[in-house]
């Protein structure tokens, strides 16, 4: 029987995070609270299956994600499920991913979202698919096999674009990568946590040059 844990980096997502946590009580969950200024930390008393790791300062999504993965690779879980705190990923995606793991035992699963939110994200994904047969590299919904992740990031020092760099490591190491189609909801209309649409597009262009 595989053991699964869910990892959720979160910054000022109290309302959507609460909704998510209320629907995944059957799983062990770790939330990396990235120095939120709302009442996210108060949720720790409402969900006994959730461990809250509170950052003393805001370190950003990718650093928070890496911190969580480093913590969980030392735990006795077979797979680590990552998902976003903004409600973009449907809860049904979790069960779908779990079932895929039980049938195929992949090293990594990528959740192919039904919608993408940025023009450059769509373009990048199409090119990425042609080269690597991976449809949605920027999806925050992924499932990592813990023993493989532990080996691949043993001596890894986080880089500026960890999110795409980790995927690159899995590809170059010829790991077994699978994918599932997942339903995705529209992200709330608010300022991006990483600097707005212009800076996100610049980030994707840089990732494109870095990866190819």
Each language-model region and where it sits:
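Cell-envelope/extracellular polymer assembly enzymes that use nucleotide-activated donors
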Residues: 3-5, 165
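Short, well-formed alpha-helical segments that are part of the catalytic scaffolds
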Residues: 7-26
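Acidic helix N-cap motif at the loop->helix transition within catalytic regions
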Residues: 15-19, 38-46
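A conserved acidic beta->alpha catalytic loop
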Residues: 33-42, 87
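Conserved donor nucleotide-binding strand/loop of the catalytic core
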Residues: 42-74
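Conserved catalytic loops of nucleotide-sugar-dependent glycosyltransferases that act on lipid-linked
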Residues: 64-65, 116-212
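Short beta-strand-to-loop acidic/aromatic patch adjacent to the donor-nucleotide binding site
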Residues: 77-88
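Conserved donor-nucleotide/metal-binding helix-loop-beta segment in metal-dependent transferases, i.e.
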Residues: 93-109
């Amino acid at each position: 029987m595989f053991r699964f844990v869910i990892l959720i980096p979160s910054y000022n997502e109290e309302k959507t995070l609460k909704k998510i946590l209320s629907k995944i009580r059957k799983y062990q969950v770790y939330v990396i609270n990235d120095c939120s200024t709302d009442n996210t930390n108060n949720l720790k008393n409402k969900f006994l299956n959730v461990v809250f790791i509170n950052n003393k300062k805001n370190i950003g999504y990718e650093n928070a994600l890496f911190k969580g993965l480093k913590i969980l690779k030392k735990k006795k879980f077979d797979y680590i499920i990552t998902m976003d705190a903004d409600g973009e990923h449907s809860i049904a995606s979790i069960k779908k991913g779990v079932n895929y793991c039980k049938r195929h035992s992949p090293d990594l699963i990528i959740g192919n979202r039904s919608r993408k939110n940025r023009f450059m994200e769509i373009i990048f994904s199409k090119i990425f698919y042609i080269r690597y047969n991976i449809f949605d590299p920027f999806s925050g919904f992924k499932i990592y096999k813990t023993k493989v992740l532990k080996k691949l990031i043993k001596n890894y020092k986080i880089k500026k674009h960890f999110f795409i760099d980790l995927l690159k490591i899995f590809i170059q190491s010829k790991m077994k990568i699978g994918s599932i189609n997942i339903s995705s909801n529209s992200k709330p209309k608010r300022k991006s946590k990483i600097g707005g649409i212009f800076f996100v597009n610049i980030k994707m262009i840089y990732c494109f040059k870095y990866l190819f």
